[in-house]
Design a protein with these regions (language model features):
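Eukaryotic alpha-helical solenoid repeat scaffolds
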Residues: 1, 116-123
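Alpha-helical adaptor scaffolds
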Residues: 2-70
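Register position in tetratricopeptide repeats
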Residues: 12, 46-47, 81, 114-118
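Boundary/linker segments of alpha-helical solenoid repeat arrays
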Residues: 34-35, 65-72, 97-110
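Alpha-helical repeat scaffolds
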Residues: 54-60, 88-95, 123
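Ankyrin-repeat and related helical/solenoid repeat scaffolds used for protein-protein interactions
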Residues: 62-90
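TPR/TPR-like (Sel1-like) alpha-helical repeat modules
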Residues: 80-103, 109-116
Length: 123
């Protein structure tokens, strides 16, 4: 718990490099802890380690005892960062079709509309 507190504190203060070190250690120590995986992913994403963040988010979602669609939303963002627009759209449509949280659904819908508008402008 203390190590997690350090990682969380570094993360909250914007020191994602140190937070990443602690989260990585926590994931090695307790690999099936979905919160550690999600938090580790959340420090990889702003460092533009999109594939690593995506993989960690996916593991987090799979190990989670509940359907946390905010994780799939972040997976979609990582796919956008890696310019995998079709994969991003799949993530966002999965949210629209399965999620009951209107807040997450509306964010996913906004990305779908934005990506569709961009594809029409570029197409």
């Amino acid at each position: 718990d203390r190590i997690y507190a350090y990682a969380f504190d570094y993360h909250e203060k914007g020191n994602i490099t140190d937070a990443e070190i602690y989260y990585k250690f926590l994931c090695i120590y307790a690999f099936e802890n979905h919160e550690y995986l999600k938090d580790f992913a959340s420090v990889c994403q702003p460092k533009k380690k999109y594939q690593q963040a995506y993989d960690l988010y996916k593991l987090s979602y799979n190990y989670s005892p509940y359907d946390d669609y905010s994780v799939i939303y972040r997976m979609g963002q990582c796919q956008i960062g890696d310019k995998n627009i079709d994969n991003a759209m799949q993530c966002f449509y999965h949210i629209i079709n399965n999620c009951e949280d209107d807040s997450v659904k509306s964010k996913a819908q906004a990305y779908i509309e934005l990506l569709n508008d961009n594809s029409e402008d570029n197409g």
